[in-house]
Amino acid sequence: MKKYKYSSYEIADIGDYLKVFACTAVMSQPIMSIINNMHQSQQTQVGFGILYNLVKYTAPAFIFGILYTTIRTSDLNGHFSYFKHLQKNWSNLFVPTIWWTLIYLLGMPWLQQENKFNSFGTFCWQFINGNAAPHLWYNTMMLQFIILMPFFWSISRYVRNNIKRAFAVAIVTLILYLAWLAFYDYYVFHGVHQNDWYLLDRVFISFFIYAVFGVLAWQFRSYFNEFITKFWWLIVVIFILCFIWTNYELSQFGYPLNFYNAPYYKPSMTFYCLAVICLIAAFCLYQVCKRQINSLRIFHFLAIYAYRAYLANVFWNQLVWRGLNMQYHAKFHPFLTLFGCWLLTWILSFSSAYLLHMWWTKVKKMIARNTHLYI
């Protein structure tokens, strides 16, 4: 297979677009939760339920994008170095995660999920389990994929360009994942272990299908790219049908609306997320084919800071919400409040991600120059 059909693909890839779309969409979710919990009318709750399901693709898209880009860059380099992989992601992912988790636990302790820490032991547990803030469960899950990257690299080496092996891997992955969803639905989602097994939602197996499919999408990019660009209309149909399906399921739980009843761990949401991923990928390929260089550069730039912006978004969300008295506005204009708070949060999150990265880069250079240590 050709490495690139278009030279413009070297500027930004499908993974970049998925990260930016996912990061942008996910920033709306905590804001919707806050506004929806303010005893809104049923009509408003219906609207928020539809919007929530619309953007409920973010974690799968991010995982797919991370695996796609990592396997792509390693494949083009001709090898995968686990040490260099961890070294790079220690600075890009682990360090920001540590700092932001500390900020949430110490600076905004009211954001903790489930239980609040009351000792050093419970502090450490909240630190690692993703309960320090509403969105940090994803960090706990995503970092598992970073650690397990050699496993997914081995899958890419196993299938290589063998379509039969790829098909077998895809089928086995789908069967295992659907079995996992059935298990989760029976035992955890409103099941007997809803309260004591809830952390299963952030174990890597709950999202591994998107990682495997991200690997296969790169390894068989000629087939994947041709399919999503040629049959984008069919993917749109699947997207609409799955979107209707997810909204129907959520409506069956009645009102007041609870976003807990719209989890990722359902067949409807799985196929919906895969459809959204394919549509975003098709959009990326369209811009690549049209050589829309400026757009590609913008997406690549934003993708670099997407994870850091994600970490910061709830922090800025809280400051915007409290500082601008958004609670008052949400009573009368819930949707305008959502979009206004969303926009401000997005701007502040990406701006702070960029500025903090620039500052941290300078600090590292100073430390390295004085101590000869790598951070």
Question: Model regions: which residues?
Answer:
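Functionally critical transmembrane alpha-helices in membrane proteins and complexes, commonly lining
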Residues: 13-73, 93-101
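Membrane-interface helix-boundary motifs at transmembrane edges
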Residues: 8-12, 75-87, 154-166, 219-232, ...
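Alpha-helical transmembrane segments of multi-pass integral membrane proteins
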Residues: 243, 247-362
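Juxtamembrane "helix-exit" motif on the non-cytosolic side of transmembrane helices
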Residues: 34-40, 110, 114, 181-193, ...
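Interfacial loop-to-helix transition and helix-capping segments at the boundaries
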Residues: 49-59, 127-141, 185-210, 247-278
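Hydrophobic alpha-helical segments with transmembrane-like composition
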Residues: 104-113, 120-187, 201-211
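Aromatic-anchored segments of alpha-helical transmembrane domains
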Residues: 24-31, 171-185, 237-251, 309-310, ...
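Transmembrane alpha-helical segments and their boundary/interface "anchor" motifs
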Residues: 52-60, 73-107, 117-134, 234-238, ...
